């Protein structure tokens, strides 16, 4: 039995130091989810987690499979889609999800979805009315 208890102690010691970092990364993801409309930067988010920017990027990607910037972009576009379904204007949606440039918003929307926000909105409206 001591072999197993020794092994459990050894593994616990290996995992424990990372537990705090895991909590910080999870908290950062939650922060992004809540504050995506705000002007967020990697420096701000990593600073709130008390982790260097480069270490934060590496850890976030390790835990979530994508960079924090990419995650933020996807959260913004997902929320933009919800607003577009409510027949909001492109200008309104752009500002509501944290973009300061309509051109940047349209470009990123197209990159992620394969279509423009207006075309996406029209397509969903047609499908909704069928």
Segments and roles (model prediction):
Residues 1-38, 122-130:
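Inter-domain helical "communication" segments and dimerization helices
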Residues 2-16, 42-75, 96-119:
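Basic/polar phosphate-binding segments, predominantly the helix-turn-helix DNA-binding elements
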Residues 29-34, 39, 62-100, 123-130:
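Terminal helix-turn-helix DNA-binding modules in bacterial transcription factors
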């Amino acid at each position: 039995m001591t072999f197993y208890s020794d092994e459990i102690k050894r593994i616990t010691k290996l995992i424990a130091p990372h537990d705090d970092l895991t909590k910080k990364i999870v908290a950062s993801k939650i922060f992004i989810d809540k504050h995506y409309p705000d002007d967020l930067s990697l420096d701000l988010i990593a600073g709130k987690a008390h982790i260097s920017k480069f270490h934060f990027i590496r850890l976030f990607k390790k835990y979530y499979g994508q960079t924090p910037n990419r995650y933020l972009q996807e959260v913004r576009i997902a929320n933009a889609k919800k607003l577009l379904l409510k027949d909001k204007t492109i200008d309104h949606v752009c500002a509501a999800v944290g973009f300061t440039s309509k051109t940047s918003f349209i470009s990123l929307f197209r990159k992620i979805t394969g279509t423009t926000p207006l075309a996406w909105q029209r397509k969903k409206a047609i499908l909704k009315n069928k």
